[in-house]
Amino acid sequence: MLIDRRKFLSLTAAAIAAPAFAAEGAAHGQIVTLPKFGPDSVSTSRIRIWLPPDYSEGGSSYRTLFMLDGQYAFAEDSDGVNFAADRRVARLAATGTIEPTLIVAIDNLEEDRFLQYMPQTIYDRTDAGVRAVIEGEINRVGKTALVSAQFIRFLATQLKPYVDTYYRTRPDRLDTAIFGASMAGVMAGSIFVEAQQSFGLGACMSPNWPIYNKQMIDYPELAAVWAAYFAQLGRPEGRRLWLDHGTQMMDAGMAPHQSAIAHRLTDLGWRRGCNLQTRVYDAGHAYAETATQMDEMLAWLLA
């Protein structure tokens, strides 16, 4: 049975509007909007970079955090309903909890968000049951194909090199993070796997592993595909991956998939608390407890 999309969207909107979503403190630093990269759909989204308060004062190089669903990244976005990542990173860096970090916020494709964030590789590797679910979502928006493979390629071969060229970054993968929530959390995991030469720090907040479908929660084929997919990471080699989900709403259905992924990674040498952090929050989907999740995630991932 499909999760009713109108109900899902209303629950998500309510969760986004929760008071816990805002971060305290004034915004600092500078936000720069990048020029458009090209005519294709995956590279025409608005992309902004947040520069830390001291960026213009010296010659230091910075870590970089790439954020999906970028229109909700900063404290002044979406009428205050946002991740407030600029405030959080500035505050955590000021206290020495994390290293100073640039933020690259990439807006989603709105109605085509699912096409952008559902991994093509998972569609290609799974069985007819899972493919039918994915095709149903593609048909719902009146399209014929995913664009996620193109999006990953754009990030790895165009956007990241551009940022590393024109801004003072530390380009090594161990200084480059990718973050997303819900379906963007799924895509953050895919970028971490498929562009692992570029992204060595990853965070998947409430990732929608079951693809909006209740039948996929305990569907062993899908959990096995996710686990095998992440096994492509091999040994950690200094990388870090954060996985979390809640216990309420649709988040409760993410547990089997997160468990399968985590077990496969620990078999490959990923140590919990060191290379791999898995959290379960007594909360609903993605945004409802962002004040807690975001601060804990940033403090661990960017320490």
PLM segments and residue spans:
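Secretory targeting signals
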Residues: 1-3
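N-terminal export signals
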Residues: 7-24
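Non-catalytic cap/lid and distal C-terminal segments of serine-dependent acyl enzymes
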Residues: 24-303
